[in-house]
Every structure is written in C-alpha cells, then in structure tokens.
Amino acid sequence: LVAIDKTLFLETESETGETVGYGVPIAAYPSEAGKVIVNSPGSGELKDGREDRWRNLGLYLQKRGLASLVTFNAPRPDFQVQLEWEPYSYQGASWNKILIESLSHTIDWSLENAKELCGNASPDIYLTGFSSGGSSVGAVAHRYPSVKRILLLSTYDSVGDPFYEGVTAFTGDIYLVYGDQDPMAGYLARILRTGKFAAKSFLVREAPECGHRFDGEANTKLLTQAFHWAFEGDNSQPLNPGN
C-alpha cells in the first residue's frame, strides 16, 4: 500500500465579500482496517507534521492495519490583512474560517472515498487535531453523524465560539491529551471538565514531562499511545514516555 496525495481546490469569501481561492493538500494512508482517522495539524505544521510525525504515524497505522489516516493542511496565514478579531488571515479571509472549512472538505473527501481508503464504504470516522487543529475538530465534529470519536491534542480554543458550540453539541466520545508543561491547554481542559456536554464520554489524560508541541522522541511515542488510547479503546494504561 502506498500513500495517496491529493490537493483540493476550494473557495471561500474574504471579509469584504471577495472570492478567495486556496488549495488544501491531503495525504492519505489506505488500509483495510474499515475505519478512517482524519487529522488536523497545528497552525505551524504542514500535512506531514513537524519532523514528519503525522506521515510516520500514518505509515505506522497503515502497516499494522489499525486505521487509515488522512492528514491535510490549510494554507499558511499570509498576514496581508490584519483582521480586528483574530491574529491570522489569508488573502483577507479569516484563517479560522478557512481552517474549519478545510477540515470539513477533507472529511467530505474521506467519506466520498471511504471504500478506497479503508475497504468500507460507510466507516466510522474518527477526528484528531493538534493545537489549533484540535480547535477546528471541536468545531465541526458534531456536523457528521459518522464521526464517533475525537482526540484533542494540546488543544486551544483558537477558533473561538464555534469550538465551544461544536464540542458541547458532539454526541460521541471525546478524548483530550495535553502536556503537564502546557498551562494553556491544561486550563482549557479544566474549563471543559466543568461544562455541560452532549458527549457520550469525556476522558482526559495529562502527559508527563511534556510541553505544548510534544517535542522529542519520548513525546512522539506519547502521541502514538494517545492514538491507541482514543481509537482502540484501551483506557487501562497511563500515558508513559517509557512505554
């Protein structure tokens, strides 16, 4: 099995009503696992991830027949226009909006091509997102009945109200992992724990000796463990960089 590389060509509107075209590169790692994981990287990452971590994870899941990973990236912010209400923009359009739309179109593409991706035309879809990518996952997961679980990694509420509105409306299982050296993500985890959710379950793990970016070999292993924990239902083992 090999990776599938694809670029979606999309359009959105700038804040002044002009049409903005943009491309969303996708990498997919097909398997016969019968389930698809759509990954939304952080704002500073391309689809393959920092040090190719999402590419390596896609190959890992593919080789073991565990799941078919689909990963993408929205266009990088270009700072041509400074919007009043958010720090990032792309050709005058809200970057948060573009990120959410990019994820939605990637999910749509994954559903349309599910048979080729995982051997199942109507699979369960799992979503995962890192940092701002996790914020976009929280915003859109509730729109898709086939999305059963989401994994939020080092997640901030960067897309704003759509994140809170979406994550509280999602009816599947929510898994959240953050590093013990990432106070902002830890603060959001505490806020979410006190909120009212439609979710079937809400489980939180704190990764030891870990910062926001999950840098280093040990923390990369923690990311892999987090995927096993969330998407294989193994809730028995703590996240441990020594495993």
Task: Briefly describe each language-model feature range.
Residues 17-120:
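Serine-hydrolase catalytic machinery in alpha/beta-hydrolase-like enzymes
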Residues 1-27:
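A domain-start/cap signature at the N-terminus of enzymes
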Residues 180-186:
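Acidic catalytic loop of the alpha/beta-hydrolase fold
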Residues 186-201:
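Conserved loop-alpha-helix segment in the C-terminal half of the alpha/beta-hydrolase fold
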Residues 146-158:
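A conserved short beta-strand
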Residues 128-137:
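Gly/Ala-rich beta-loop-alpha elbow adjacent to hydrolase catalytic centers
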Residues 170, 176-178:
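Short beta-strand/loop motif that positions the catalytic acidic residue
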Residues 79-84, 89, 200-243:
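C-terminal catalytic histidine-bearing segment of alpha/beta-hydrolase fold enzymes
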